[in-house]
């Protein structure tokens, strides 16, 4: 049976060609419902204090999505969308954030890329445990989760042993999920109580730091 996917914030990268060329192509395609915000752009450049360029665009409100500012930040090989910030509400949430991002791709980035010759890299809106962990680490976590007593976490000796196996396996790799991803996977995919999932996420973070410190302290 296919494991349930988790909805995640998408990332967008514009790569290839010079930053100046990408910038010019993007701005040449900006039209309603998008607009350029040079004032906010200059403010952000002043705060950044570096040589990286910033492009700030504003998407007018639509459906039940608030007017929002989209920030493109220069990287060595192009630009990436570093954030999308609503004007009148606290946060967009994953679904609305991704809707705005895909709207930008459709109305601005794709037409600009066709004329400018740069590439668009848009990540998936959903991910699974296998996107975040190696096969061995993912198998160890699934084994722990599916055999553990979800009301007690890793307190039973056998559950604790399987939890430690997962921690040690992850420690030996560079491919790791973060605490938010772990908690969301436990809750949304495996059905763990939120309190127990958060406890395990905290323990996971502490254990990896401790194991790394132990490695560094060895002669």
Model regions and ranges:
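Short, extreme N-terminal segment that most often corresponds to the first beta-strand
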Residues: 1-41, 219
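Amphipathic, interaction-prone secondary-structure segments
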Residues: 17-19, 32-75
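Charged interaction segments
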Residues: 56-181, 185-208, 212-217
């Amino acid at each position: 049976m296919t494991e349930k996917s988790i909805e995640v914030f998408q990332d967008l990268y514009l790569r290839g060609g010079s930053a100046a060329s990408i910038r010019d192509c993007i701005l040449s395609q900006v039209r309603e419902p998008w607009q350029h915000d040079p004032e906010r752009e200059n403010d952000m450049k002043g705060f950044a204090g570096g040589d990286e360029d910033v492009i700030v665009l504003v998407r007018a409100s639509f459906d039940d999505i608030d007017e929002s500012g989209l920030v493109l930040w220069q990287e060595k090989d192009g630009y990436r969308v570093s954030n999308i910030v609503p004007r009148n509400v606290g946060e967009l949430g994953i679904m609305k954030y991704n809707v705005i991002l895909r709207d930008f791709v459709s109305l601005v980035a794709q037409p600009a890329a066709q004329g400018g010759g740069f590439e668009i890299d848009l990540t998936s809106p959903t991910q699974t445990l296998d996107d975040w962990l190696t096969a061995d680490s993912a198998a160890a976590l699934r084994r722990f989760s599916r055999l553990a007593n979800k009301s007690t976490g890793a307190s039973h000796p056998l559950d604790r042993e399987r939890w430690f196996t997962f921690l040690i396996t992850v420690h030996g790799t560079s491919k790791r999920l973060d605490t938010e991803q772990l908690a969301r996977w436990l809750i949304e995919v495996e059905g763990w109580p939120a309190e127990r999932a958060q406890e395990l996420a905290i323990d996971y973070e502490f254990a990896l730091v401790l194991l790394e410190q132990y490695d560094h302290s060895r002669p």
